[in-house]
């Protein structure tokens, strides 16, 4: 059972920001998601392709406590979709991603740390 760790030094928009973008017009939310996925793929391209189910621990590191936790961790959807788009996962359904855990810390650099564990 291998564990892979990757840092994504990226400040994701809050869920509220994403919803507001989606309300602007029918293309704005999709364009925002596409841009975020392209940014994420830069960091996840060094990952291998996972052929067995995985679980992921997300450690969300923020510079302060201003944003609600649920407004931060919704971004896992962008990360998982990016992993599928980059060919690292066949799909992000329950057959391939069997669980995840969110933890939150505060530091100088806003980022998310993924700990991906292959399950057998």
Specify the residue positions occupied by each region the protein language model found.
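Catalytic phosphate/metal-binding cores of nucleic-acid and nucleotide-processing enzymes, i.e., regions
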Residues: 1-120
């Amino acid at each position: 059972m291998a564990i892979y760790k990757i840092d994504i030094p990226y400040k994701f928009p809050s869920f509220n920001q994403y919803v507001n973008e989606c309300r602007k017009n029918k293309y704005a939310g999709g364009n925002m998601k596409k841009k975020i996925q392209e940014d994420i793929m830069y960091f996840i391209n060094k990952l291998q392709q996972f052929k067995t189910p995985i679980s992921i621990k997300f450690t969300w590191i923020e510079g302060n406590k201003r944003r609600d936790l649920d407004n931060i961790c919704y971004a896992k959807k962008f990360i998982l979709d990016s992993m599928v788009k980059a060919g690292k996962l066949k799909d992000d359904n329950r057959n391939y991603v069997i669980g995840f855990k969110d933890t939150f810390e505060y530091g100088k650099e806003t980022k998310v740390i993924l700990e991906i564990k292959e399950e057998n």
